[in-house]
A protein has these predicted regions:
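Small/hydrophobic positions within alpha-helical transmembrane segments
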Residues: 31, 62, 66, 130, ...
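Intracellular loop-helix junctions on the cytosolic face of multi-pass helical membrane proteins
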Residues: 1-26, 53, 57, 80-85, ...
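A generic, lipid-embedded transmembrane alpha helix
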Residues: 32, 66-67, 93-104
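Transmembrane alpha-helix boundary/hinge residues in polytopic small-molecule transporters
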Residues: 42, 73, 138-141
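Intracellular juxtamembrane helix-capping segments at the cytosolic ends
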Residues: 134-151
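Pair of pore-lining "gating" transmembrane helices in MFS-fold secondary transporters
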Residues: 15-46, 126-130
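Central cavity-lining transmembrane alpha-helices of secondary-active solute carriers
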Residues: 58-78, 168-175
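Helix-to-coil boundary motifs at intracellular loop junctions of multi-pass secondary transporters
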Residues: 46, 50, 80, 145-149
């Protein structure tokens, strides 16, 4: 009888932690897509204001070549970092860089206040490439992390919910940005203007993406380890990598 009660309690505990894991993964993806939705809308507007709309096709072409060394760096990091640490790395880097770009958007000569457009303005190109790489190096890294801690059966049962939350994140951040720009949502101390609007939205998106590693770290600490590995090959590789780092 006691063995049966123990098994029942174990099943309830497993279900609880599985639900907590799903909630954390869904919340993290909600925040990731919420941030991406905001910055994606800033990419072309900032580039056209600084460089010029006629150079947008060139930016798309050059971006493909810029991604090559970034992908090579990613493949190297995959070999030395665990999937969770890789996610922390990219979300923190993007959050901090977002603050830096937000600051320089208001710079009198580098940023938006300078209305002289031209291809020689390096900041506009850097901003475009920075936002363009968000999808492959943040969104895709998040999926890689989720895959590494989810079995195929679990993925089949839970990924639909995660995607639904990501859609909600995109819709919610888009609506909030629209309400802010239309002055429905007003911040008393903020001096409104095109430059400040861009800066505020980028700072908000940066704060959102920086909250993702906090959610994932909470999940990694609370959810038992036996629920945090999926594909066995990936799990064994992660264990070997952890031993190599500790030694």
């Amino acid at each position: 009888m006691s063995a049966q009660n123990t098994q029942t309690g174990g099943d309830k505990s497993r279900r609880w932690y599985s639900m907590l894991k799903l909630a954390c993964l869904s919340a993290g993806f909600f925040l990731t897509i919420a941030s991406y939705t905001v910055v994606r809308e800033l990419k072309d507007s900032v580039f056209m204001a600084i460089i010029g709309k006629e150079y947008v096709p060139w930016a798309k072409i050059v971006s493909l070549f810029i991604l090559i060394p970034a992908i090579l760096l990613y493949t190297r990091l995959v070999d030395v970092l665990r999937r969770s640490h890789l996610l922390y790395f990219y979300t923190i880097i993007y959050g901090l860089m977002g603050f830096g770009f937000a600051y320089f958007l208001g710079h009198s000569s580098i940023g938006l206040p300078n209305t002289d457009t031209g291809p020689y303005r390096l900041f506009g190109w850097l901003f475009y490439f920075f936002i363009d790489a968000f999808d492959p190096f943040v969104v895709c890294v998040y999926w890689a992390f989720a895959n590494s801690i989810s079995s195929p059966k679990e993925a089949k049962n839970t990924y639909g919910i995660m995607i639904a939350f990501s859609k909600l994140g995109g819709v919610a951040s888009g609506i909030m940005a629209m309400l802010f720009l239309s002055r429905v949502i007003k911040i008393p101390w903020l001096v409104y203007g095109d430059v400040v609007n861009h800066q505020f939205l980028l700072v908000a998106a940066s704060f959102i993406i920086l909250s993702v590693p906090l959610v994932i770290q909470f999940m990694m600490r609370v959810v038992p380890g036996y629920l945090l590995h999926g594909y066995e090959a990936v799990y064994r590789a992660e264990k070997r990598r952890a031993r190599d780092v500790s030694s």
